[in-house]
Amino acid sequence: MNVDIQKIREDFPILSRTVYGKPLVYFDNGATTQKPRLVVDALVDEYYSVNANVHRGVHYLSQQATELHEASRETVREFINAHSTNEVVFTRGTTESINLLVSSFGDEFMEEGDEVIVSVMEHHSNIVPWQLLAARKGIAIKVIPMNDKGELLLDEYEKLFSERTKIVSVVHVSNVLGTVNPVKEMIATAHAHGVPCLIDAAQSIPHMKVDVQELDADFLVFSAHKIYGPTGVGVLYGKEEWLDRLPPYQGGGEMIQHVSFEKTTFNELPFRFEAGTPDYIGTTGLAKALDYVNGHGIEQIAAHEHELTTYALQRLKEIPHIRIFGEAAERGAVISFLVGDIHHFDLGTLLDRLGIAVRTGHHCAQPLMQRLGIEGTVRASFAMYNTKSEIDTLVAGIERVSKMF
């Protein structure tokens, strides 16, 4: 990576703190990333100097806040290379984005006996909403299997399509295995069957270039907090020709043009899907986070994280009795593992006492855990500010804990 990692780390104040008297080693980036100072400063500054409700306000502060909010939408559009800001819907996060799409798409286009295709490695947020729709409308959920390396079986995927298949909804990068799924190829396959695709990009957007036009994605979702932005803000991208055909998800202010007791006419895109007061300050934080990523270059970030992941795999494999889950040729900056008979919770707890933050459990992917034949793992996930020396600290910590069992 052709940037100064130490300088990057200085942009993230939390990385200088200690935990139990030890320097913080933060390897829980798959759950949420830390925030650079310029993001936090932007949030504080807007609260102090610009705070006012957006849209329809005639006063100066409201107009200024609206300009910032809509400029943030343009920043997102440019970052993912959408055609228009009409295709960028702000939500509270990936989970709400998926629920919005499932509800609106399901109501408009799916009937009893229709089918959605998902994969075995989905996060619960891309399983449970479809199950709720299945309970309500009687749709069927078909599941793409994977091999023992953690790679989706594309031949089996092809076989799942039928005349009742209405949509494919798959994760781009597994939050457990790190597998980078070939979503461009999978989208092309779906389109050959006349079926649209929803891509869960929560674990890919911080780590690699995501271009919705290059992928030809019909819908794509992600969260701000996974890419150095604030919590409570997410994005639903949808091709305009698809979004224009979907009914609203929620009713309320802003998503309407005219209301009477007899009839309501709905607003134009994207506001039709943004009922109520948006997190207009959070969207500023997201835009600043995307600017920060652009400032360092997503390709350079990806190269650095690939180097880190390769090094981590090499070092972790030196530990006796370690089991690393996922051996896909294309993988992201996530490594899940177990060591001997040590329970994942015990290992994670004892690493925490050494100042090392990892995630333990099923990672909201219980069907995948069932496929792997385990209850949970320890997960280390990396970001642009992590270093090889931190990986050495992790390995030393695991070795120290292992001697206790």
Q: For each of these PLM feature ranges, what is it?
A:
Residues 1-405:
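Pyridoxal 5′-phosphate
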